[in-house]
Amino acid sequence: MDLSTYFEPIDISIVDYRSREFRPMLGDTIATYVERDAFPDIEQATLAIIGVNDDRLSVDNRGCATAPDHIRRYLYRLARPHEDMSLVDLGNILPGSEPRDTHFALIEVMHQLLDRGITVVVLGGGDDLVFPIYKAYEILGRVINICSVDSRFNLEGGDEVNSNNYLQHIILQQPNYLFDYVNMGYQTYFVGQEMIKLMDELKFTTHRVGELQADMTHTEPLVRYSDVVAVDISAVRQTDAPANAVPSPHGFYGEQLCQIARFAGMSDKTSCFGIFELNPNLDNHGQTAHMVAHAVWFFIEGFFNRQNDFPYRDKQYYKRFTVELRDHGMSIVFYKSMRSDRWWMEVPCDDDRRQRYQRHTLIPCNYSDYQRAMENEIPDLWWHYYNRLNA
């Protein structure tokens, strides 16, 4: 299939990029779609950027369709994070006559890229685009984890997918290919106790923004476990990201978003990183677009510094620890990477579930989880996924 039929070239008048000789910039390194007869060759690419210029299903945030080229305006001017990068920018997916046509195009594009082993950065566009991203993995038959950096849960009702209810539509798909959904950064006054209880009943993982800000290292295992990391820019506080129709005075700081983005880039498992709901019409002198460009830069920098140290690949690169929990009559197996000092722990389940969820039975964790087990306590993360795998 010719992917170029789904794309339009980048609007250079908005990007306004010019090469500078005094230092190599990211824009000099990316193979970019700027002329109709010169679509980038993806055969050697390992990372692709795509924009989606559609905001018709973004609730109360019309204008976010134009975000991709505004982000590129700042992204291309940043320094090259790595000397040898096989990176392409395929331009922007052409909006269909109906939103569902845009969704179909995104599904096809994601399917083709993921099937080639290419990791994708998606610049939205509205949050509803997470639904067609999920559908692409469904076509590939991959059971996935989604990490949503969002101040809300996106579980509202409605027959048509939109930015406020895409999660509801994902969990209603049958057969279902969602193993876990992680929300990082919800704000209680936006979601309410009933919705928090519902997320708990669904056995999804949720973390308040204040809880994570107390120690941002806790976000790393959550991101490392995710196939898709989707950022709603409203999760970042208004002072750092004003370009959204429903901003909040509270939320993550811009540098914390960059930290999360780098964790996602470093994750061997993450194959899609998306940022949505940035509305340039509401921006302050490009402040939000510039901050998001930094987050994308950190994802790229992390991606090209991946350690490929997921356990089971080569025993010489990790250590295995078995911790006996005497008071509980059980043991937990931990793995530590010798390359990156990152940790994982095994969660047992029956053979049928292990075969279906084989990519999800080894849980990323922190050294603190190992320490807790050494003190004869079962880590909360282990309990959560034990209950999920053995439900």
Language model feature labels by segment:
Residues 2-49, 56-275, 279-391:
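Conserved alpha-helical scaffold segments that buttress catalytic/binding sites
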